[in-house]
Amino acid sequence: MPVDLLAIAAHRDDVELTCAGTLLKAAAQGYRTGILDLTAGETGTRGSADLRAEEAARAAEILGVAERRNAGLPDAHLHNDEASRRVLVEEIRHFAPRVVILPFPVGRHPDHRIASELARDACFLAGLARYPAGGTPHRPHKILYALAYREDPVKPTFVVDISAEFERKMAAIRCYASQFDGARNAGEIFPTGQDLYSLIETQNAHYGSLIRTRYGEPFFTHETMAVDDVVALGVQSM
């Protein structure tokens, strides 16, 4: 059954770190949500692929996603090649999402950068009727980039208020004890002296402050956003 919102990321836990609150909010609004992890995280320094699979299953239950799948691509060896694109095209056709969340295409981790490019290309190719892959052709309507933990001077296109979802987001993140307990950095998150959980809260509080709420998750789109009612625009200017 198709999902309304699909989050794609390189590793189990990437989605939880960047957009778990948004997935929780969408599910509460009645939308079907899904997660596609591209790798099993088998080359990670901490934990193991099997343990991370168990942690991901527990996190998915908290997030209330309709389905979580793994593409089985090689961790630390992602490539935007024909074989990988075909795998992702079949996954996208399986989920048939309207909106897709991808990693931001700039970052220190090679897998994150390549996952973004690979998944975006696959979203286009999945709509080609004659592209040689399984499934019914489908092209997502919208691509969003999760912008959390960036140091680039990129202003979010919009920020989702996750104040009501923040505690459950943290509960999902804490499922990955093998990765985060005692850690001070992860993925795109550089160490600051805080423990990782405190640092995540600081980041989410920062983005929440930009829209005058307690916690938020930032997103970027290449397209200009349409507004139907300028009088109803949020975020106070004065």
What are these language model-derived features?
Residues 1-95, 232-235:
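Active-site rim/loop-helix segments in enzyme catalytic domains that contact anionic ligands
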Residues 1-6, 81-238:
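Metal-dependent de-N-acetylase/amidase catalytic core
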